Amino acid sequence: MDTITDIQVLKDTHKINGPEDLINKLPSIVGFKPSNESIVIVNTDIFSDYIIGCKVISTLDLFDLLEHVNDISNDVGTILCYYTNQKLDKIRPSAERLFDYLNNSINVRDVLYIRNNRWGSFICFDEKCCPTRGRVIE
């Protein structure tokens, strides 16, 4: 699997219109389709929905992820996208702990999961917005 070792600052900003648009655009932004057991860290302009940088990590290991996010400043918004084939109950606790930990020091806008051609949020509990079973990726 391809891995970007540092946050890749993008030459062009990419406007996103919500989580599904982000998930659909990520393969072209990072240059390949993220696969199971990877996390994409998306940095956005803190006041807008423009992507300014991305990083792909080829593990769901919480400690590996923490190493990579320690250098993110408060001046960016961060969205974490988990690509997984595991049952969500297995990774939800670590995703929620990660959100709690990171949100004390950086602006975490969302923690998304992508599984079996569906996406959802680990931190949004509004069934109209983010149903528990996720939304089909179109």
Where does each model-flagged region fall?
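Charged, compositionally biased boundary regions
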Residues: 2-30, 35, 48-49, 54-60, ...
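Short beta-strand scaffold segments in enzyme catalytic cores
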Residues: 38-42
